[in-house]
């Protein structure tokens, strides 16, 4: 979450609008603040991969895993409606990865799996969506731990 978002959210809430927050979970203290202050009505958090695959998936040398786990734990407390979601990329996600992510999210309300969609603005070239059968298999694996929905 960018600096300065808090006053903006307060202004938007003051106008009577509902706020959905999309986050990658890197700033759990900011997430906790805006939710505790009643500024967020719904949160959606991207969970990119397992701990071992996270940095590669996000294209950085390191991933803020401690912060991401803290955000996951906080959202799982259920103070507001929320969802977790993973964009599934054939080159980054295996059945074992999906099982591990699902186990970590166990106890959460819902996890959406969505296939990767290539676009000109995607900085990394050569990535692919899994086929529909693989997505369904991944959904079945996820459902052993958490309600898992395939979003196309």
For each of these PLM feature ranges, what is it?
Residues 1-128:
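Conserved AdoMet/S-adenosylmethionine-binding subsite of the radical SAM
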Residues 71-82, 138-150:
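A structural motif corresponding to the C-terminal end of an alpha-helix
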Residues 121-144, 149:
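Glycine-rich phosphate/pyrophosphate-binding loop and the adjoining helix
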């Amino acid at each position: 979450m960018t600096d300065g978002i808090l006053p903006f959210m307060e202004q938007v809430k003051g106008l009577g609008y509902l706020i959905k927050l999309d986050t990658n979970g890197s700033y759990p203290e900011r997430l906790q603040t805006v939710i505790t202050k009643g500024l967020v009505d719904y949160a959606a958090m991207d969970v990119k991969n397992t701990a071992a695959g996270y940095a590669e998936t996000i294209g950085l040398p390191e991933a803020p895993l401690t912060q991401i786990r803290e955000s996951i734990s906080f959202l799982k407390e259920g103070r507001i409606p929320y969802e977790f979601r993973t964009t599934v990329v054939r080159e980054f996600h295996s059945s074992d990865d999906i099982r591990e992510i699902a186990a970590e999210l166990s106890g959460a309300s819902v996890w959406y799996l969505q296939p990767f969609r290539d676009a000109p603005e995607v900085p990394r070239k050569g990535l692919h969506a899994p086929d529909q059968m693989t997505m369904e298999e991944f959904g079945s694996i996820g459902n052993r731990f958490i309600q898992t929905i395939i979003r196309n």
